[in-house]
C-alpha cells in the first residue's frame, strides 16, 4: 500500500459508470481496474495508469479562480462513459490530494508515485488539478529519463519568477523545472504551444528567450500550415529521447473550454491541437502525459470536462 503517503487516496470505483450497450467491453468503464498496492505494480504486465492530482492550491497562490481540485474525478467520470476503440486495459490508481495548502508535500508524493510506476515499466496518464501538476510530474520522471524534453500546450509560458526555497504556484512550474535543470547541470528542453500574446507579459517573453524556450503562438497555429507546425515539432524533438507532454485546457478557446481559471477568448479550437498531439504520441517519444486546469465549478454544461475526456480518449487510442 502507499500508506506512507499521507495525501494519497485510493481510487473510487463509483466514478466509473456508463451505458451497457452490448456484452462486449466497449467503453472505458468496462476496461478499468483498481490498484492501491505497490506489489501489484511490480509485474511484467505493463499498464497505462490514471493518476489524479487534486489540487488548486497553486491556482489560489497565483490569484486565480479555484475549483480545479475537483478536476481529476470529473475527468474520470466523463472518460468512463466513452467508447474505447482499442484492446488495452487501464488502471485507476486514485488521486494525490492537496489539503491545507500542503502543495509541496503533495507534489513530492505525486512525484514518488510517478517515479515508482515508471521504474516498473508503466506509463502515467495524469489528471489535474492546477498546472502545478507539471512540477510534480517532472520530478517523478527526471532521474529516469536523462534526455527528457517538456512540451506544454498552453496559453501561458508558466515561467513566472521563482527562486529556490520560495513557494511555487500554477504559474511557476516551468521556472521550477528550469531552476532544477540548472542545479543539476542538465539542459532545459521546453517547448510551449499556443502561447497568447496578451496572456503573458513582455518580461515573460524575455524570460522565455533567455531560457531558449521554443514556442508557437496561438496566432502561429491559425496562420501556419500543419506541415509547418509539424516541422517545428520535429526540430524540437530531434535530439530528445523522451517527452513529457502536458496539456493546459486554457490553450483552448472559451467557447470550448469555459471551465478553467483563465479562459481564452482568442484560444484555439480542439482540431487545431489534436493533429499535433497525435503526431507527438505517434513519435513514440512521449513517456508520460497529463491534462490540467479543469475546474468543474466554473464549467458550463460539462463542456470542458467532456472535452478533456475526449482529448485523453483520442490520445490513448493513438498508436
Curated annotation (Swiss-Prot):
Its cofactor is Mn(2+). SUPFAM superfamilies: Arginase/deacetylase. CDD domains: Formimidoylglutamase. GO terms for biological process: L-histidine catabolic process to glutamate and formamide; L-histidine catabolic process to glutamate and formate; putrescine biosynthetic process from arginine, via agmatine. Mn(2+) 2 binds at residues 154, 156, 248, 250. Binds 2 manganese ions per subunit. This is Formimidoylglutamase. The lineage of its organism: Bacteria, Pseudomonadati, Pseudomonadota, Gammaproteobacteria, Legionellales. The gene is hutG.
